[in-house]
């Protein structure tokens, strides 16, 4: 990994419904180096770009009477959920759906694209990457995140094997490939390491501080090339939501020879530390550029952003200042 990468989180998901071709395309065309698709499997084993297994928050599935019989309640990763699930639909059924904005009140401009954009398969995204790379004149990246791996494997829908097949088809299996795979589930990454040489990133949530102990990081280094930190591990906050200064996580991970990605940067007040918020509603954009600056000062290797243009602009200004 060279330099601070800007990664469009679920595409430019601050501007278009997440995980759609429009969101990914906009991220790349806004200057992002890579995009991040979450990946799960359909009933017939096709890898598709969705964050949640349950579909009603981000698609129009509830408006499809022909699918009403598939609504059910089930436990997913320890949580009871009710609705329509990706793994209960085959690809043909999923293709009848259209994407919707996850937070329509907060992201009204994105919600204007509701019910227009189809669900994308991972294969289609990899093809789109090739097209956009040719257009941009540079190798654009993809940071695949595998979701709900154990749950899907228990249903006979493993993620690793079909992913490896896709990577081989697209010649994206070497350490130099513009593709990274991320996951919270270490077993998924270990399985991939036996098959491909691409960069692998172990994700760590803000409450998983034990994962940052030196012994644990040594084990991560046996299969991964990087760690993806929740941004509050890099820049902790107090009980009032104010930043308390840099935490030790970035230095600790990098001291083990591992790259550091940070997730997820969002420009709205709701997601910023108190001191970077501006007067107005939670959906109003605050001083997100200052959060980017603080993370770059820590020397992070990549940023996952819903509004990638913000990080692109900060990095461009920073690069220009150094060149003077």
Residue ranges with predicted function:
Residues 1-324:
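Phosphate-group recognition and catalysis centered on beta-loop-alpha active-site segments
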């Amino acid at each position: 990994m060279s330099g601070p990468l800007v990664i469009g989180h679920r595409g430019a998901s601050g501007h278009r419904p997440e995980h759609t071709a429009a969101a990914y395309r906009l991220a790349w065309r806004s200057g992002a180096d890579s995009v991040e698709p979450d990946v799960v499997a359909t009933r017939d084993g096709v890898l598709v770009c969705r964050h949640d297994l349950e579909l009603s928050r981000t698609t129009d599935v509830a408006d499809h009477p022909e699918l009403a019989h598939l609504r059910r309640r089930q436990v997913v990763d320890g949580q009871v959920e009710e609705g329509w699930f990706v793994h209960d639909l085959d690809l043909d059924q999923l293709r009848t759906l259209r994407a919707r904005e996850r937070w329509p009140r907060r992201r009204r401009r994105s919600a204007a694209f509701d019910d227009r954009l189809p669900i994308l398969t991972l294969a289609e995204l990899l093809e789109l990457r090739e097209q956009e790379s040719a257009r941009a004149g540079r190798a654009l990246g993809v940071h695949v995140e595998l979701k709900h791996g154990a749950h899907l494997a228990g249903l006979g829908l493993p993620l690793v094997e079909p992913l490896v097949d896709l990577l081989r088809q697209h010649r994206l299996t070497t350490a130099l490939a513009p593709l990274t795979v991320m996951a919270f589930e270490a077993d998924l990454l270990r399985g991939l390491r036996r098959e491909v040489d691409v960069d692998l990133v172990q994700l760590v949530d803000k409450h998983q501080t034990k994962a940052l102990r030196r012994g644990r990081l040594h084990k991560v280094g046996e299969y991964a090339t990087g760690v993806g930190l929740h941004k509050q591990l890099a820049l902790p906050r107090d009980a009032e939501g104010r930043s308390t200064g840099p935490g030790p996580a970035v230095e600790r991970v990098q001291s083990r020879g591992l790259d550091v990605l940070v997730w997820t940067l969002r420009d709205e007040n709701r997601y910023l530390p108190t001191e970077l918020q501006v007067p107005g509603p939670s959906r109003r954009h605050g001083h997100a550029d200052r959060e980017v600056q603080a993370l770059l000062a820590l020397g992070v290797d990549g940023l996952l952003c819903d509004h990638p243009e913000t990080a692109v602009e900060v990095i461009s200004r920073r690069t220009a200042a150094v060149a003077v």
